[in-house]
Structure formats: structure tokens, C-alpha cells
Amino acid sequence: MFKRLFKKTKYITVSSHNLNEKDTTLEKPLIPDCMWSKCEKCGQIIYSKDLRKNHSICGFCKNHFRISAYDRVKQIIDEGTWAEMDKNLCSVNPLNFKGYNDKIEKAQEKTDLNEAVITGVGSIKGEKTVICIMDSRFFMGSMGSVVGEKITRSIEKSIENRLPLVIFTASGGARMQEGMFSLMQMAKISAALSKLSQAGLLYITVLTDPTTGGVTASFAMLGDIILSEPGALIGFAGKRVIEQTINKKLPKGFQTAEFLMKHGFIDKIVNRKNLKDTLSMILKLHREKCEFKSYKDITVNKVNTLKNKLDAWGKLSMARNEKRPTSLDYIDNIFENFMEFHGDRYYGNDSCIVGGIGILDGVPVTIIAQQKGRDLNENIERNFGMPNPEGYRKALRLMKQAEKFNRPIVCFIDTPGAYCGVEAEQRGQGEAIAKNLINMISLEVPIISIVIGEGGSGGALALSVSDKIWMLENAVYSLLSPEGFASILWRDSTKAKEAANIMKITSEDLKSYSLIDKILYEPDRDASKNVKVMSNIIKNNLIKEFNNLMDLDRDELLNKRYNKFRVIGEYKNKT
């Protein structure tokens, strides 16, 4: 049994001859250069075929790889619909820059492109569109005379055929070798885009990695709607230039898509896999000549003749109840395909103001809403329903956009008031509210505002200069909060209940003074008991009223709105 333990082991003798020589049988197998790709963000090695199947998105860290213009065509454009324009337009050497012609030829051979942008007409899920796609492989997507000319011709094509325009940006900025000819393309394209806007046509930009320099400072940031792929580098000046100028290290995430969205310059960050669907939906939301489908079948709710027993304080308490439906509850139940857009294009995005486009019975409608939270975390995110200046500026931007595309506007009001804080004052809270008031009175599209909860002071009025102002039965609309009223007049905020009952803040009070146009009665005296029924009441009233308002010509609409506010006030001549 133990003999095997002590059995002598036999070894094979190996010659040391040629051990130091290279054994060709041990060489690594030859792997084609394009078989594997390395993610620059996480360092993972990815099988290229799998990467392409995944829209060139890293499956480990979700990094979006840079892709060619023609790969973009395959991903976005319906098969068989792409018709390229101006393919043979090529660069010359206006400054006789040494070596420029040779570099152009090498770039053309390497990329199979004639220039840094391809342009054409194609369909995105059936929506015919003029499309420009930049390619950073060609001179880093820099903008010279040809890029400027091809994009300008595309804009003119959009105007001529009344088609929307989509531009995918990917650029290092100006083409150094073309000097001032390059710089002037920024003005040339912007001038053409001005004509596109005057024609009332949609322009969407999709910012991809990288979008910098003169492209950022011109057509990239002029879209009616600005989308971006996640993590894209977007900025005007380069990071090194900024660091050298300010002699400081820049923060992590600086000049990314996420950074720009936080600061109010991007409407939406969209994963590449969802880009085609997102673009298609935006294009559908901007179709011309839409009509309400079921207008003739609509019946609005009858007036509830039973007296509501709640006093003003009771209604205020109900309006503030955390179970009361929020603006987003109504948006989800009333509108189809609601798409939210972000940013004021100046400073930031205020999550207290929700804005976007949705479909109301077949008609695209711009929706602006003040949103409260249901718990502490959500209330912190929504700033307890108190908008900052950037919220009002975002609202005005979207309302101006609605005017351009002839869309009616509905505003949901639910705020204790505009945010009172040092930073809000520094950023011009008063100016932001004032600009909304003066602009809303002259918007050439119908506007309906609905107070669904609290309507607090100028913070509510900033979204209420409308053709029709409605209130839910248990909503309130006031000069300021009863607590503030009691503090100012009686220096005792504990008298808020008494203040509420003398301030005339209920829907019945305000309707009796003709300060609002309609009361929407709540199911079972409480909207929170049946959100769907309440939503249906609002929806039917909106369809009916918008249909009436859209029949008015421009002058009649604006005159009626002006006169609505002109006659407000109680006074007499002293005898």
C-alpha cells in the first residue's frame, strides 16, 4: 500500500539546445486590427462585432464611442430613403496654406469622405427630414468653407421644401488652415438659420462627442430643441486653454453633456439606442395642421349645485395636502406621448417647473406645470413647488416655441409662491416674472391656465396671463399666503386661519368677482379620490375650449386677452 509513496518518479530529459531561440509555434495568433476595440473610458476590450450590434456603446460603462457619419445614417435613417446632397463639394486652399492640400487628400483616402459633413434628405420613422451629419474623423470635424456651404444649402433645402432640419454635430471647431473664411461660416450658417426660424420650421441639434469651438458657438446651440448623447464633450474653449487662463484645475465632469444640461443648455440627454425613436416623436409633435379628433363628442362636466361646506382655510388645507394630485399626475392622465424638455438657455434647469409637449386628442400642446413633491426627498428636488428664475425663463422659452409652431399652451398652477432667496434675487426673480407677464399677454396662440392646488402670488400669476383661467373646486389663488398676510398686517402668523377666511381666495370667491373664468368641480368633493375622473373633466374642458379659441383670428384672440385684464379693478371717482 505504501510502496507507491516511495516509488521513484521518472522524468523526461529535455535538451537545452535552441531554448533561447524563438519558437515560432508559440507565437500569438494573428488578430485583425478591427476585431477588438478598447473603451477609452473604462479600458475594457470589446469584440467589435458585439460593439456594432450595441450601437457602438460600451456594454460595461455605457460609454458612447465616436461613430462615422455613414454609420449614423444606418442607425437613424429609414432604409432606402437616404438621398445625399452635394457629395462632391470639396475644399480648396484659399490661403495657399502649405501642406493643406496634401492633408485633405490623405483625410479623404482614410475616411472615404470628401469633407467633414454629409448632408441629405431622408426619413426618420416615416418623417421626411433634411439631415446633416458631421464626422470627427475628417480633420476632427473642423468647419471650413465646404462644411459651411453644405450646411447652409441644407438649411435652404429645408426652407424650400418646408421640411424639418436635424444636424448631428461632431467637431473640434474652426478649420485653422482656412483662417477667416472658416470663422465667417459661423455667421453664414447662423444667418441661414434665422431665415429657417422665420419660416416657422423645426430645427433639432444632436450634440455628439466632441462638439467644441466655433460649431458650439454657432449652429450647435441654436436648435429649437437641443439633444445630446450621454457623456459628450461640449464646450467653446478647450480645457487646457481655460486651465491656463484661470490657473486652476477644472472640476470633474466639466464640459460634458450632463454639465450643460444641469446649467440649462440642453433639452434632453438621449441614449444612442433611443435616438431614432426620440427624433421621430419630436418630429411628429411638430406636424403642421392638426385638429381635435373627438371635439363633437365631448361633453363637459355639469355644475355641482351642492354647496361646498369647506371654508377658505379648509380648502387651503386640502390644496396643500400631500395626497392631492400633482401636475404630473394630470399630465400623465390627460396627454399622450408627453416629452419633457429642460433648461432656460441662460443658467440652469429648475425641476420645480416641468415643461414639454404632449398630444391632446390628436393636437400637440405645450404644457407648463408647477410641480410639488409627495415626500421630503421629492420636495427638496422640486424646491417645495417654489420656482426659481430659471424655471420661469424655461417656461417662457417653451411658450415662445409654442407660438412659433402655432401650438396652444396649457399651464398647471400649484405653488405657494416664487422662491424667496438670495440667489434667486441675484439671478433676477422679479425680472423673470415680469418678462413672463409682458410676453404672455402678446403670445399669438391660445393659453389656458388651471389652478389645481395653491396659486401663490406672483409665482402663480407668472403662468396665468391667459385667455382662460380655471380653478379646481378646492384650489386657492391669493395675493400671498395667509401666514404672510397675517404677519404683515397683524404681525402674528398664528392668525393665518382668520386671514384665509377674509382674503377671498377660494374658487367661488374669485369666480364671483370674475377674476377667474370657470370652476372645475372635483369628484366626491376631493380630486385625490379619483384622479382619472378629475383628469377626464379637465381634458374634456380643454378640448372644448381650445377648439373655440383656435377659431379666433390673431387680433381677436389678443384683444380679448388684453381686455380680460384691462377691466380688472374696483374704484370710484372722489366727489
From Swiss-Prot:
GO terms for molecular function: acetyl-CoA carboxylase activity; ATP binding; carboxyl- or carbamoyltransferase activity; zinc ion binding. GO terms for biological process: fatty acid biosynthetic process; malonyl-CoA biosynthetic process. The keyword Metal-binding applies. Its EC number is 2.1.3.15. It catalyses: N(6)-carboxybiotinyl-L-lysyl-[protein] + acetyl-CoA = N(6)-biotinyl-L-lysyl-[protein] + malonyl-CoA. Its cofactor is Zn(2+). In the N-terminal section; belongs to the AccD/PCCB family. In the C-terminal section; belongs to the AccA family. This is Acetyl-coenzyme A carboxylase carboxyl transferase subunits beta/alpha. The gene is accD.
